[in-house]
């Protein structure tokens, strides 16, 4: 091994950028606290070749067909909407990260999960680093989650928390939250990047190594930053098996759990909940809940059907176009601002509507985030409805993607979207060309471009008013 040595590098855990010395902030991605010292092997080709020599495996490789799939089967949590997102339930030995804004209802949801888990004959342990056991007990009484197989421990030291797991021997562990846990095996302050990564790594290793029937399934609560990202390095998401985002507007009781990553099922599913003073409940038909709260037809509103994973959901867009008191303003909520600006520019250019010289306000109802391109046409018709001061009929929807040329394009799952619209009682659908079939009771009106769609909207509105 002559001529070779171990040397140090300073590498960013976010972007893998290598710095010549330690710095607090990565010069490449600008993230704070992600530059760590790592040891690398440097030397001649002989050493590198020796380092690549094989080692006898402790267990042989086997054909994939000989592996028992039951080892990683799903265990239902008892919360149907969460099971929907998880692909059927929690997998033994898995680690799930649930992230969301403070106060959105993460602790309430997971206390309900622990209670349902206990009701199925299994034991759950709730570890809290943010609240005392007495505070959790008060919430449990308020929400009716007081099963005697739900164990509580207020602990922020990781080693002691692992001792609680060894003593209680649960099959489900909830850690609320991973940012409040600390370990003596890593430097840094509690909640810092180094500590969060070390705690998550230790918990993941424990879950994978645990034995039992079933093994321990863990759910970690994670905080989010101001821009909605999970607090801590992005490598945190790579350490866990499942990443879920808990979303919702504080002005609304509707909450959504959205799958971002899932090693055991589809990663694009969404579950719907309603938060009450006495707990949280599943909403199996969120579209019906939305329609119950919808007011009478007014100018500036349009309805569409989006697809969140495999679930069709109704979404309402509201727009307001008004003369400016100064420089024209733009305010967008629940819709991508760049896409909203693009749709406004298309209306300005293709339909000769002076959108750019007016104030424009766009919002979704109930705190929904419309990222599906199928909502483009509804956004455009909501703006046109507000500009012309004409209300679209209550039973009309719009589905389609808008191109820069003003053309309308079909979106995936059109049959499923139209079936959902017909089920909810809609009678007219404005869609792009090429839709040849429609469910009974739903009239499909095809528009070649955005100009034709706006004209169709005006004709439908006038006919509905007569």
UniProtKB/Swiss-Prot annotation:
EC numbers: 3.6.4.-
* Organism phylogeny: Bacteria, Bacillati, Actinomycetota, Actinomycetes, Mycobacteriales
Q: Does the keyword Methyltransferase apply?
A: no
**Keywords on this record?**
ATP-binding, DNA damage, DNA repair, DNA-binding, Hydrolase, Metal-binding, Nucleotide-binding, Stress response, Zinc, Zinc-finger
Q: Could you say which residues bind ATP here? A: 100-107
UniProt-recorded name of the protein: DNA repair protein RadA
Q: Which GO terms describe its molecular function?
A: ATP binding; ATP hydrolysis activity; ATP-dependent DNA damage sensor activity; damaged DNA binding; zinc ion binding
- Residue ranges for the region (Lon-protease-like) are 359-466
Which NCBIfam families has this protein been placed in? sms
The role this protein plays is: DNA-dependent ATPase involved in processing of recombination intermediates, plays a role in repairing DNA breaks. Stimulates the branch migration of RecA-mediated strand transfer reactions, allowing the 3' invading strand to extend heteroduplex DNA faster. Binds ssDNA in the presence of ADP but not other nucleotides, has ATPase activity that is stimulated by ssDNA and various branched DNA structures, but inhibited by SSB. Does not have RecA's homology-searching function. Also inhibits the diadenylate cyclase activity of DisA.
Indicate the enzyme's highest-level EC class: hydrolase
What InterPro entries does the database record attribute to this sequence? AAA+_ATPase (IPR003593), DNA_repair_RadA (IPR004504), P-loop_NTPase (IPR027417), RecA_ATP-bd (IPR020588), Ribosomal_Su5_D2-typ_SF (IPR020568), Ribsml_uS5_D2-typ_fold_subgr (IPR014721), Rubredoxin_2 (IPR041166)
- Report if keyword Amino-acid biosynthesis is assigned: no
- Output the superkingdom of the source species: Bacteria
Motif range (RadA KNRFG motif): 261-265
Native source organism of the sequence: Mycolicibacterium smegmatis (strain ATCC 700084 / mc(2)155) (Mycobacterium smegmatis)
Zinc finger (C4-type) boundaries? 12-29
């Amino acid at each position: 091994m002559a001529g070779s040595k171990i040397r140090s590098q300073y590498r960013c855990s976010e972007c893998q950028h290598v710095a010549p010395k330690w710095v607090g902030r990565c010069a490449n991605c600008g993230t704070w606290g992600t530059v760590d010292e790592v040891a690398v092997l440097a030397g001649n080709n002989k050493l590198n070749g020796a380092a690549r020599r094989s080692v006898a495996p402790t267990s042989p490789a086997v054909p994939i067909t000989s592996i028992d799939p039951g080892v990683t089967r799903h265990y239902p949590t008892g919360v149907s909407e969460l099971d929907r997102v998880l692909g059927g339930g929690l997998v033994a030995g898995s680690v799930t990260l649930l992230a969301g804004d403070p106060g959105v209802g993460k602790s309430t949801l997971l206390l309900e999960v622990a209670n349902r888990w206990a009701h199925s004959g299994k034991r759950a342990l709730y570890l809290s680093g943010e609240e005392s056991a007495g505070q959790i007990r008060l919430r449990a009484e308020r929400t009716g989650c007081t099963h005697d197989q739900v164990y509580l421990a207020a602990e922020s030291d990781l080693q002691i928390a692992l001792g609680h797991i060894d003593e209680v021997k649960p099959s489900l562990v909830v850690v609320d939250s991973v940012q409040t846990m600390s370990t003596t095996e890593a430097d840094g302050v509690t909640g810092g990047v180094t500590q969060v990564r070390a705690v998550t790594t230790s918990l993941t290793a424990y879950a994978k190594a645990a034995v039992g029937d079933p093994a321990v399934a863990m759910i970690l609560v994670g905080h989010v930053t101001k821009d909605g990202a999970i607090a801590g390095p992005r490598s945190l998401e790579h350490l866990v098996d499942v990443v879920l985002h808990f979303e919702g507007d504080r002005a609304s009781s509707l909450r959504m759990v959205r799958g971002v990553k899932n090693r055991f099922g589809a990663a694009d599913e969404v579950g719907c909940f309603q938060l009450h003073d006495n707990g949280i409940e599943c909403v199996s038909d969120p579209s019906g809940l939305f329609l119950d709260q919808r007011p009478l037809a007014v100018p500036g509103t349009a309805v569409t059907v989006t697809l969140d994973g495999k679930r069709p959901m109704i979404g309402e867009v509201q727009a307001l176009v008004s003369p400016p008191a100064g420089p024209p303003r733009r305010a967008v909520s629940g819709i991508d601002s760049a896409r909203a600006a693009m749709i406004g520019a298309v209306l300005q250019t293709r339909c000769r509507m002076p959108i750019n010289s007016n104030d424009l306000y766009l919002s979704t109802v109930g705190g929904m985030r419309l990222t599906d391109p199928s909502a483009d046409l509804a956004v455009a018709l909501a703006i046109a409805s507000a500009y012309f001061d004409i209300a679209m009929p209550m039973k009309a929807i719009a589905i389609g993607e808008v191109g820069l040329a003003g053309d309308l394009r079909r979106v995936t799952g059109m049959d499923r979207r139209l079936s959902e619209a017909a089920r909810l009682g809609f009678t007219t659908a404005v869609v792009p060309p090429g839709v040849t079939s429609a469910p009974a009771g739903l009239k499909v009106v095809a528009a070649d471009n955005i100009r034709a769609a706006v004209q169709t909207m005006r004709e439908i509105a006038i006919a509905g008013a007569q």
